[in-house]
UniProtKB/Swiss-Prot annotation:
Homology family: Belongs to the PAPS reductase family. CysD subfamily.
CDD domains linked to this entry: Sulfate_adenylyltransferase_2
Listed name of the protein: Sulfate adenylyltransferase subunit 2
Transmembrane feature ranges: none
InterPro entries: PAPS_reduct_dom (IPR002500), Rossmann-like_a/b/a_fold (IPR014729), SO4_adenylTrfase_ssu (IPR011784), Sulfate_adenylyltrnsfr_sub2 (IPR050128)
Molecular function per GO: ATP binding; sulfate adenylyltransferase (ATP) activity
Keyword set, alphabetical order: ATP-binding, Nucleotide-binding, Nucleotidyltransferase, Transferase
Matches recorded under Gene3D superfamilies: HUPs
Domain of life: Bacteria
Organism: Baumannia cicadellinicola subsp. Homalodisca coagulata
Subunit structure: Heterodimer composed of CysD, the smaller subunit, and CysN.
Catalytic activity: sulfate + ATP + H(+) = adenosine 5'-phosphosulfate + diphosphate
Length: 302
């Protein structure tokens, strides 16, 4: 009998599906974080494969800051309706009442209150003991050293010195009362593999990933797409149409576009093959001098 050899992408797919099923078998109340980006779309696709023909055995959670791109909100609602999964949307109402926003309070405070604290609120509100996320090790240095099962204490804090060994594909999911884990099924994927998989599996993604002429403001070296009227232009600033796309998506004032002509998936893949920069170069929160990604994770960030 001829032995079938899996391609590299098929091996990654099998590993991710194994992780998804393992967590559902081990944990009482899991949830999948849904940030609406390309990695979330791939993770959702893998989850639907993992539990086909049944429905997803967990809800999806979107932590809404109120500052996502309008196209992201449209895509989120359309996807939830098309696939019929349970979608939970949580917003930090206290932060919203305080008027917290990235322009007035800066990226660090905005992220801490509207994302980190909001996520912790949702974890406590629904009593989730495991949360899937689409982070990958190739994205950023603190994520590179994080385990697939990332253990958090009862305050949702991550201690990089207190991690469990993961030998081969064996994961220790034992937790104490009040503790939880963050699970990263895409840990071993790279950005180019994500795009190749999206192309091969014909996965729907937010149109912002494709190049198009968009209203752009250049500020502090970032190409900011003006998505609504909540921005005040500084002296000498102008908005002009530029051909851009996004490699990563987040709050629109904190997410920089890249100049590009890639309007199809093959074009994006070609562009990625010659790119020498990280996709997260366009995320303002990663450049906060006093609040690195590791510090955010120690405070409870995903």
């Amino acid at each position: 009998m001829e032995q079938k050899h899996l391609t590299h992408l098929q091996q990654l797919e099998a590993e991710s599906i194994h992780i998804l099923r393992e967590v559902v078998a081990e944990f009482r109340n899991p949830v999948m974080m849904y940030s609406i980006g390309k990695d979330s779309s791939v993770m959702l696709h893998l989850a639907r494969k993992a539990f086909y023909p049944g429905k997803l055995p967990f809800p999806l959670l979107h932590v809404d800051t109120g500052w996502k791109f309008r196209e992201m909100y449209h895509f989120r609602d359309h996807t939830a309706k098309a696939y019929g999964f349970e979608l939970l949307v949580h917003k930090n109402l206290e932060g919203q009442a305080m008027g917290i926003n990235p322009f007035v309070h800066g990226s660090a405070k905005h992220t801490n209150i509207m994302k980190t604290e909001s996520l912790k609120q949702a974890m406590n509100k629904y009593n989730f003991d495991a949360a899937f996320g689409g982070a990958r090790r190739d994205e950023e240095k603190s994520r590179a050293k994080e385990r697939i099962y990332s253990f958090r204490d009862r305050f949702h804090r991550w201690d990089p010195k207190n991690q469990r060994p993961e030998l081969w594909h064996n994961y220790n999911g034992q937790i104490n009362q009040g503790e939880s884990i963050r699970v990263f099924p895409l840990s071993n994927w790279t950005e180019i593999e994500i795009w190749q998989y999206i192309f091969l599996e014909n996965i729907d993604i937010v149109p912002l990933y494709f190049a198009k002429e968009r209203p752009i403001l250049e500020r502090n070296g970032m190409l900011i797409m003006i998505d609504d009227d909540r921005i005040d232009l500084q002296f000498g600033e102008t908005v002009g149409q530029r051909m851009v796309r996004f490699r990563t998506l987040g709050c629109w004032p904190l997410t920089g576009a890249v100049e590009s002509t890639a309007q199809t998936l093959p074009d994006i893949i070609k562009e990625m093959l010659i790119s020498a920069t990280s996709e997260r170069q366009g995320r303002v929160i990663d450049t906060d001098q006093s609040s690195s990604m590791e510090m955010k994770k120690r405070q409870g960030y995903f």
